[in-house]
Amino acid sequence: MVDFIGVSRVRELLARRGTARFIAELAAEIETDFLRWDTFEKSPRHATHSSVGVIELMPASDGRLYAFKYVNGHPKNTQAGLLTVTAFGVLADVETGYPLLLSELTLTTALRTAATSVLAASRMARTNSRVMALIGNGAQAEFQTIAFHHLLGIRELRLFDTDPRATDKLERNLTRLQLAGLEVVRCNSTASAVAGADVVTTATADKRNATILTPELIVAGVHLNAVGGDCPGKTELHRDILLRPDARVVVEYEPQSRIEGEIQQMDASYAVSELAAVLAGRAPARANEREVTVFDSVGFALEDFSALRYLRRIHHEERGAHSRIDLLPQLADPKDLFGVLSAHPQWLLAAADVAA
């Protein structure tokens, strides 16, 4: 039997843990795994692209556990009443190859993305950062808001989306959340949202090179949390922002970010640091208060490895329905796979009747 975590169980775990605590604990798990970076077998995700979206497989292993995530990205899905991003994942035992956990990762991907974003910002943003602009108010927006409000101390949130319905949705959800001490300001343009912000989060979905932020909007000292660019041909920042002499860019896994991140716009000699090096103190997060820092986030398999490991742990810690599924046959003789069927001869007889 294999542990199973569905959407209802994730909702139950969030209700018991609290979303802010869940994100904080997940960020700690991600940091722990990034700090043992060299123990992981890493590779860029395997992507199958179409004209309307992408389907990806994201593997990672530390030699003891193996994890993968299946995830899609289809920006036009919302027009058909479907999610832009859906995902599930597996955590397996390397020694036997047996899966230990099958889990939903649609909700969890949003949570781990917010956890990674705020983990990076805790090192890269100025320590007195209190104002965040949130450009793109779709599926990621609430999770980013909770993470940055509770874990970075954001007190003013400025919202803008080209689709006003997305901002309507976000405002409704933030009203329900009643985040103490957070002022929410609806803006009528990217420029008005960004003006005076300490942190700018871009989380847009269009599968194209979209110039969400232009050079004249960027002031000294700001931290850019660029979340939306995550596949070839899909970026959010004008390349001149990256060319600023005071810009410092941090990525998750450089070989993947060269393909999918904002730095796909740059040549191979463009210098970046990896988040693991920043967390370990081997690379600076910010040299001074005037540097423009950029977290070029595309999402990396190690974060999903951490998320699956965390989910399995709290699944066993918290009371409630500990679901398991018969994903694998249970055999008295591991060499007799057919025995699973012969234990129920009526099935074989039914098959014989069809053949006759």
Predicted feature residues:
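Rossmann-fold NAD(P)-binding glycine/threonine-rich loop
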Residues: A226-A283
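Short helix-loop-beta connector
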Residues: M124-V131, G153, V219-A220
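NAD(P)-binding Rossmann-fold cofactor-contacting core
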Residues: L151-L177
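Glycine-rich Rossmann-fold phosphate-binding loop(s) that bind the pyrophosphate
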Residues: N137-G138
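N-terminal ligand-binding/catalytic initiation module
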Residues: M1-A110, V118, N128, L302-F305, ...
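Short acidic-hydrophobic, aromatic-tinged amphipathic segments that line or gate anion-handling sites
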Residues: L182-S192, V250
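Rossmann-fold NAD(P) dinucleotide-binding segment
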Residues: A191, A195-G196, K207-H223, R239
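Short, well-ordered coil/turn residues at beta-beta hairpins
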Residues: T201-T204, A226-V227, E252, L308
